[in-house]
C-alpha cells in the first residue's frame, strides 16, 4: 500500500522525538522513501545518525549545510513528498506554521510543501491548553492541516493531562489513511455491519454464532482508506476498532436493526456482512436457569429481518449489498435472497470450502447481481473487500 510513497517526517525538540525512529522504521519496512528533517533542538533528544541509519538518507537540520548535495533541499523535498508529518510538533513550530515563519530547514520545507500535512502536538498540558496555542492550531486546521489530538497521561514534566504524543502505531495509521489508496470513494457514506449478535437466554447464557467480524472490519478499513465516510455497526468481537471509522457497538439483533434502520437513510451504501440471529428466545429469564432432570425446550421467535426492511425502504440511488453463507445450493439460495430482499448485490460463500468462512483471514466468494455472477479466487479478506467495493463503485456509476 505504501510502496514507493515519499514521506517527510519533521521532528522538533521534545522528549517524544525518540519515538519517531520507530515510526521511520515502520514506514521503511513498507518500502516507503522516508526523509527526516530535524530542528536543532531535536538533535538534543535523538542523534540524526539514528534516522540516517534507518532511512538511508541524510537527516537534514541546517538549511545551509555545505556538505549536502545542492538541490535547494527544502524545495526538492517539499515537491517529492506525498505526505508530511511533523511529530512531535512543539508549540514553537506550530506558531511558525500558523504565521508563515520560515527560519529553519523544517519550517521552510513545510511552507513549501503542497502535500497533506499532519501535525502531532507534544508539549506540557498547560502549554497545549494555552489559548494562543489553541488559536494557532485552529489556523492550521483552517489551512487543511490535520491535527492529531495528543494523548492524555503522565507527562515528562510531571504534570498529568493532554500533551503526550500518540504512539508510533497511531501516527502510522494517520499516514496510511492519507496515502495508502486512491480516494475513489471520497464523498460516499458507507454503512458496514459486522460480527455476530447475541440473544440472551438468561443472565449467563445466550444464542450466537461463529462470526468473528473479520470480513466486515476489512470492508470498513478498505472503504475508509479509499476515502469513504464509514459507519461500522458491530456486534461483540475481539477485534480492535477500525481507525477513523464511526463505531456503533450493538449486542442483539434488535439493537442492530435500530442502528441500521436509524442510520441508513443518510447513507449511500449499506454492506451488511454481520451474522444476525434469525431467532431469539421468546422469554428471557431474569435469573440463571438451573439444571433440572430431563430435557429442556426453549421457545424461539423470529427477529426482525433487517435486510428485508431496508430493501423495502431504500431510495432508488442507494445500494444495498448483503452476504449469504451457505453449505449447499449456494448460487440458487443466494439469488433467491437477492430477489426477495430487493438487494443490488449479494456476496456468497460456502462454509465448507477451505479458507472461506468464519475466523479465517482469507475468503473465497462469488459476487451476484441481477445480471451476472463473478467468482473470485481465494484471497485475503482485505483483497475481497476491495473487490466488493470496486464492484459497488461500478454499479454506482451506472445508477
Where are these regions (language model features)?
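A cross-family phosphate/adenosyl-ligand binding-site feature
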Residues: 1-118, 124-213, 217-399
Amino acid at each position: 500500500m505504501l510502496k514507493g510513497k515519499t514521506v517527510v517526517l519533521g521532528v522538533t525538540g521534545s522528549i517524544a522525538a525518540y519515538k519517531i525512529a520507530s515510526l521511520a522504521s515502520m514506514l521503511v519496512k513498507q518500502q516507503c522513501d522516508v526523509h527526516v528533517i530535524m530542528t536543532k533542538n531535536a538533535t538534543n533528544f535523538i542523534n540524526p545518525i539514528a534516522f540516517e541509519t534507518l532511512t538511508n538518507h541524510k537527516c537534514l537540520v541546517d538549511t545551509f549545510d555545505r556538505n549536502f548535495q545542492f538541490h535547494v533541499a527544502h524545495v526538492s523535498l517539499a515537491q517529492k513528498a506525498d505526505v508530511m508529518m511533523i511529530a512531535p510538533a512543539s508549540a514553537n513550530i506550530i506558531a511558525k506554521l500558523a504565521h508563515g515563519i520560515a527560519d529553519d530547514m523544517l519550517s521552510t520545507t513545510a511552507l513549501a510543501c503542497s502535500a497533506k500535512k499532519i501535525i502531532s502536538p507534544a508539549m506540557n498540558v498547560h502549554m497545549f491548553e494555552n489559548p494562543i496555542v489553541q488559536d494557532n492550531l485552529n489556523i492550521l486546521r483552517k489551512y487543511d492541516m490535520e491535527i492529531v489530538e495528543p494523548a492524555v497521561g503522565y507527562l515528562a514534566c510531571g504534570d498529568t493531562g493532554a500533551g503526550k504524543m500518540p504512539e508510533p502505531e497511531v501516527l502510522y495509521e494517520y499516514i496510511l489513511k492519507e496515502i495508502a489508496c486512491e480516494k475513489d470513494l471520497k464523498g460516499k457514506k458507507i454503512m458496514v455491519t459486522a460480527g455476530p449478535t447475541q440473544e440472551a437466554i438468561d443472565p449467563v447464557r445466550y444464542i450466537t454464532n461463529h462470526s468473528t467480524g473479520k470480513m466486515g472490519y476489512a470492508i470498513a478499513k478498505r472503504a475508509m482508506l479509499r476515502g469513504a465516510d464509514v459507519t461500522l455497526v458491530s456486534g461483540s468481537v475481539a477485534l480492535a476498532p477500525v481507525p477513523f471509522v464511526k463505531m456503533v457497538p450493538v449486542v442483539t439483533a434488535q439493537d442492530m436493526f435500530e442502528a441500521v434502520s436509524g442510520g441508513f437513510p443518510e447513507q449511500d451504501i449499506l454492506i451488511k456482512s454481520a451474522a444476525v440471529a434469525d431467532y431469539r428466545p421468546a422469554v428471557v429469564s431474569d435469573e440463571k436457569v438451573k439444571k433440572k432432570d430431563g430435557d429442556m425446550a426453549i421457545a424461539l421467535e423470529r427477529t426482525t429481518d433487517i435486510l428485508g426492511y431496508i430493501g423495502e425502504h431504500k431510495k432508488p440511488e442507494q445500494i444495498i449489498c448483503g452476504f449469504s453463507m451457505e453449505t449447499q445450493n449456494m448460487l440458487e439460495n443466494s439469488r433467491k435472497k437477492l430477489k426477495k430482499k430487493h438487494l443490488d448485490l449479494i456476496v456468497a460463500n460456502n462454509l465448507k470450502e477451505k479458507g472461506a468462512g468464519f475466523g479465517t483471514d482469507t475468503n473465497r466468494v462469488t459476487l451476484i447481481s441481477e445480471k451476472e455472477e463473478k467468482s473470485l479466487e481465494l484471497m485475503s479478506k482485505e483483497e475481497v473487500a476491495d473487490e466488493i467495493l470496486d464492484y459497488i463503485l461500478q454499479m454506482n456509476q451506472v445508477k
